[in-house]
Amino acid sequence: MSDSFSLLPLPLVSQRYAHALFDLVQKEGYVGDVEKALASFQVILEQDKALKHLVQSPFLSVKEQVKAVCAVCENLGLAHKKAGQILRNFLCVVAANRRLSALSGILQAFQRRVALSRGEVSAQVISAHPLDADQKKELCVALESVVGGKVTLRLSVDPAILGGLIVRLGLYQIDTSLATQLSSLKLALKKEVS
């Protein structure tokens, strides 16, 4: 039984913008403030259909996109505090570079980078059956020993994997599910027959 690892990176553009923002706000000492402001912006982005259209539309001019982003930032009160000004300027640069379509990926990459800087890692765990408290604790301890930091488990159940676990940790996926093992065995048997 072998664990298979596969990289699951966010698009490179999203990572670059997120890391640039993180580096800037870390140097200035505003990571927490920008994280909160970015979370507010993300909520508005998810709820406001007009803003979502603006972000996704390739037909609007750069000027219109920058103007709309500035207006949203103003409504959030981002222009009045230093952290808000940094975020406002960052979002305007994203808009000016026609990268608003990558904004949700940028937000996600930024959140990952902040969690990583705090030594926190979020692990998505998919199991065929709900895990009991002892299994959760044992899995958490094992993952924390691997990453050397705090691990938060996000659990979900998918009976289609038949047994075992699928763990997504950072950029890696560890798949020990019975469904994957059976699929691998099936491919190996087909290879032997041909």
Swiss-Prot record:
InterPro entries: ATP_synth_OSCP/delta_N_sf (IPR026015), ATPase_OSCP/d_CS (IPR020781), ATPase_OSCP/dsu (IPR000711)
Family of this protein: Belongs to the ATPase delta chain family.
Gene: atpH
Signal peptide range: none
UniProt xrefs under Gene3D superfamilies: N-terminal domain of the delta subunit of the F1F0-ATP synthase
Subunit structure as annotated in this protein's UniProt entry: F-type ATPases have 2 components, F(1) - the catalytic core - and F(0) - the membrane proton channel. F(1) has five subunits: alpha(3), beta(3), gamma(1), delta(1), epsilon(1). F(0) has three main subunits: a(1), b(2) and c(10-14). The alpha and beta chains form an alternating ring which encloses part of the gamma chain. F(1) is attached to F(0) by a central stalk formed by the gamma and epsilon chains, while a peripheral stalk is formed by the delta and b chains.
GO molecular function, one term: proton-transporting ATP synthase activity, rotational mechanism
Membrane topology: Peripheral membrane protein
Function, in words: F(1)F(0) ATP synthase produces ATP from ADP in the presence of a proton or sodium gradient. F-type ATPases consist of two structural domains, F(1) containing the extramembraneous catalytic core and F(0) containing the membrane proton channel, linked together by a central stalk and a peripheral stalk. During catalysis, ATP synthesis in the catalytic domain of F(1) is coupled via a rotary mechanism of the central stalk subunits to proton translocation.
UniProt subcellular location: Cell inner membrane
One term under GO cellular component: plasma membrane
Name used for this protein in its record: ATP synthase subunit delta
Main location: membrane
Keywords for this protein: ATP synthesis, Cell inner membrane, Cell membrane, CF(1), Hydrogen ion transport, Ion transport, Membrane, Transport
Keyword field contains Transmembrane: no
